[in-house]
Amino acid sequence: MSEKHKWWQQVENIDITHLGPKRKAYELLGRHEEQVLINRRDVMEKKDAWDVQEFITQMYIKQLLRHPAFQLLLAFLLLSNAITIALRTNSYLGQKHYELFSTIDDIVLTILICEVLLGWLNGFWIFWKDGWNILNFAIVFILFMGFFIKQLDMVAITYPLRVLRLVHVCMAVEPLARIIKVILQSMPDLANVMALILFFMLVFSVFGVTLFGAFVPKHFQNMGVALYTLFICITQDGWLDIYTDFQMDEREYAMEVGGAIYFAVFITLGAFIGLNLFVVVVTTNLEQMMKTGEEEGHLNIKFTETEEDEDWTDELPLVHCTEARKDTSTVPKEPLVGGPLSNLTEKTCDNFCLVLEAIQENLMEYKEIREELNMIVEEVSSIRFNQEQQNVILHKYTSKSATFLSEPPEGANKQDLITALVSREKVSDSNINMVNKHKFSH
């Protein structure tokens, strides 16, 4: 016998005589239908227990990942691993303490794998929305695959990846994190500056190969050699040795003067202007970030001050219990009928957010179109010809209304004062409506 049938048998055996006064109250309120008894298991969702457990686990996992002790432990292990990698560069220490260094590497890799798995438990799709998580997963995946693929288990691959993981640790320190964020935010502008410098290098390399390729083949034999020579000139280290090769045994002043002008122009554009642009881009972004941080700090201070003032001034008034009872309804409540709504999933929440965003974008576009239409109407109405027509029509309607009001009909003397005023008001309203319609039509 199912649990549902057992429940109904228990309900039938219960004495419900004590419900008589309640039924009479229902009848007095005009509710002649009988009270419906519902099994609570039909109302409750079976997935709720699992959802509660999943929510609790995610909450504890999130607290663990964000806990300062866990972050400090991870930073300590990564720093120790970086130190062991630096010590392994010495062949004597690497052979003597090989087992210790390999054990530290395995422990650090295990902790990194556990961190990735905990991030997946916290939210699989949320994990991939952070760029640092993607970088950590790529590093851990390559290091883990090194146990199975020998080509990946190389010192040239594993050591740089382990040291690269320290970048995420630097994000925990606020000054270092600020500098890293500034560099990452400056990457598009820095890419534009690099493209500009590369363009100048290509142009000057073509000039150098064309003008000096036959005389100084050591530095301007082809495009590759010329680009390398110009890169040395940008660094401002070694360009003087390149220029000394222009001074041949047989003095040719044209070559020396041409080379001097060539290097002077390129070093001025590439080294002084180009490299200083890098510094300008980074410093401007750093200043903007500092200003935004100061503004946010001032806003937080203002919010805290206002909250403190509200706590001191705005106190809830005291209410007597009798007044509170008057507001609460004493009508007997019906039990919940029907099943609950389906649990909200992440997919439906994302779809709902997308719909809200689309509605907001449509409203913004509607406002822009409405503003453009209003501007067009204003421009059309500001034309002199349209203004003259509008004035003529207004004068025509105002003159008609004035003549109508000044010359009342013969039967008006026989009417009451109220009827005459109502008729005149209707005439004036009709004239105003006609004028407004004419304005909107133009």
From Swiss-Prot:
Principal location: membrane
What controls how active this protein is? In contrast to the human ortholog, not activated by progesterone. Activated by intracellular alkalinization.
Look up keyword Cell cycle and say if it applies. Answer: no
- Please tell me whether the keyword Thylakoid is annotated for this protein: no
Q: Which domain of life is it from?
A: Eukaryota
Protein name, entry field: Cation channel sperm-associated protein 4
- Look up and give the organism this protein is from: Mus musculus
GO molecular function ontology, one term from the record: calcium-activated cation channel activity
Q: What Pfam families does the annotation carry?
A: Ion_trans
